[in-house]
């Protein structure tokens, strides 16, 4: 029988891969986040191994709940089309399929800045705002 749990959010960054269970009603982390240094080189397989570590760390809380993964890249339908702060071997990688195979869970992969914008509209200062909303991200890279 499937074990329900809290969805897990994972952000793949240039210097660290961070993850935590997420309370989708409040738009907040449900537990303190875990950060693991981004492997060098940050190939798809190496990053998938770190994602596995994060999934294992939060297994009790997340059960078999879906995982959302953000990456610093252009992503269309789960496929990475560029590579900023990650290895160029990501280009044309079906990241959703790769991570679903590694974790055994439903995985959705999107661009990190896109995810931040959507979260801001649903939970943050842009909630209920009509018109254009601009979000700038600053990290190892600028989005």
Regions found by a protein language model. Give the residues of each.
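A gly/ser-rich beta-alpha-beta helix-loop segment of oxidoreductase catalytic cores
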Residues: 125, 138-140
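Short glycine-aspartate micro-motif
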Residues: 5-11, 66-68, 132-137
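Short glycine-rich, Thr/Ser-proximal phosphate-binding strand/loop in the N-terminal lobe
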Residues: 2-49, 80-82
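Conserved Radical SAM active-site core
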Residues: 59
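Glycine-rich phosphate-binding loop and adjoining helix at the ATP-binding site
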Residues: 32, 41-52, 56, 65-67, ...
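Phosphate- and other anionic-substrate recognition elements at nucleic-acid/protein interfaces
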Residues: 62
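Conserved A3 ("GATE") glycine/threonine-rich loop of ANL adenylate-forming enzymes
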Residues: 15-16, 113-115, 140-142
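Short beta-strand scaffold segments in enzyme catalytic cores
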Residues: 17-21, 73, 142-143
């Amino acid at each position: 029988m499937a074990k329900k749990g809290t969805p897990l959010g994972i952000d793949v960054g240039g210097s660290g891969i961070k993850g935590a269970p997420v309370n989708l009603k409040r738009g907040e982390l449900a537990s303190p986040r875990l950060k693991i240094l981004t492997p060098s080189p940050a190939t798809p397989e190496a990053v998938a191994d770190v994602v596995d570590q994060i999934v294992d760390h939060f297994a009790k809380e997340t059960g078999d709940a879906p995982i959302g993964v953000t990456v610093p890249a252009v992503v269309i339908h789960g496929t990475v089309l560029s590579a900023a702060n990650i290895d160029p071997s990501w280009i044309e990688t079906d990241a959703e399929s790769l991570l679903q195979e590694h974790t055994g869970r439903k995985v959705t992969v999107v661009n990190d800045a896109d995810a931040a914008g959507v979260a801001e509209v649903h939970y943050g200062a842009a909630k209920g705002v009509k018109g254009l909303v601009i979000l700038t991200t600053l990290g190892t890279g600028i989005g």
